[in-house]
């Protein structure tokens, strides 16, 4: 999906659920306690694209949880992320949880992963259920989450691709 497509889908999803143009511009907290570690991963790259997309659509973005914000967007499933979502909800903030992980992705990923996959599923369900809106990158993962019994609103938004990295003149 090209960056412009991602921006339009993101903006439509955010407007549908949280846009506060009549009051003031929305401010989104892109939360990751271990941001520097996460940024080295595929999820971290998705976070960078999300930030660029939001800013490109005139949405103010912060990564500092001490700042005031309207919506917290969480991409990871660490305990600190779960507790941030709970804190935000308690303060009346909206929570967008990006569901990058499923039990099916976790299974067979390392020796012994199948033994703890049921616990992993319980944990991610607990995390994702804190979201007012759950974003997931594929229809397949959406169907898995629905199959888990998650009742929260789930929208599919493919992770963006920076098409400037694939210019014809760069393929020489």
Indicate where each model-derived feature is located:
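N-terminal subdomain of nucleotide-sugar transferases
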Residues: 1-66
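Acceptor-binding helix/loop patch of EC 2.4 sugar-transfer enzymes
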Residues: 33, 97-122, 148
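Short, well-ordered alpha-helical microsegments
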Residues: 80-83, 142
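Carbohydrate-associated surface elements
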Residues: 140, 157-160
